[in-house]
Design a protein with these regions (language model features):
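Interfacial loop-to-transmembrane junctions
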Residues: 151-175
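Membrane-interface helix-boundary motifs at transmembrane edges
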Residues: 13-18, 79-89, 156-165
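Alpha-helical transmembrane segments of helical membrane proteins, especially in multi-pass transport
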Residues: 92-157
């Protein structure tokens, strides 16, 4: 069990770049299909109306988030690393590291879709039982920590940086990814 957990924690660094890209694409498409099926993303930002959007829009949003996550990290990797690294390796490893975020939809699959939808629309979450909110907050925070850790492991493998310098550069790249993703999603919503 200890070996399994150890392998799972360092998986973004030990998996081959091609496998990381293929698994990442599988989870990206699977997450887009699940998100489309559950229709948990608001179709209107203003009044939180819920409904179905086209499947392709979920795939486009997923790809936009993936690209906006990988571009700043690619820039930092190119600046730090002395030898060249393939663009598809950076995109593949960062897409693989994004897999834990897909698990946010699991409670909708196995639980109450209405409570899950209300939790995701934060202005409506005050109507939920406190135990459900605490469980979901813990669950979401654990997945985000897992995502950031896997991203750091993949980043450290690509840049060959460990310690505080690696953490600081990864933090800067993630902040750049956040800003870029906010811009990209904002542009997609306006289209």
């Amino acid at each position: 069990m200890r070996a399994f957990i150890g392998n799972l924690l360092c998986r973004p660094a030990t998996i081959s770049a091609k496998q990381a890209l293929l698994w990442g694409l599988f989870w990206l498409l699977g997450g887009a299909i699940l998100g489309w099926y559950f229709s948990v993303v608001p179709t209107s930002i203003v009044d939180y109306t819920w409904g179905r959007a086209a499947l392709i829009s979920y795939v486009i949003y997923g790809v936009a988030i993936w690209v906006s996550l990988a571009l700043p990290i690619l820039l930092v990797v190119w600046l730090v690393r002395e030898d060249n690294i393939a663009v598809w390796e950076v995109f593949g490893r960062m897409l693989f590291a994004h897999i834990p975020i897909t698990f946010v939809m699991l409670p909708a699959m196995f639980g109450d879709k209405l409570n899950y939808s209300l939790f995701m629309a934060s202005p409506l979450s005050s109507q939920l039982p406190i135990t459900y909110v605490v469980f979901m907050m813990t669950y979401v925070v654990a997945l985000i920590v897992w995502f950031f850790y896997w991203g750091y492991v993949a980043f450290g493998h690509m840049t060959q940086l460990k310690g505080w310098r690696g953490v600081m550069l990864y933090s800067v790249a993630i902040y750049g990814s956040y800003l870029l993703s906010q811009y990209a999603i904002g542009e997609l919503i306006r289209m």
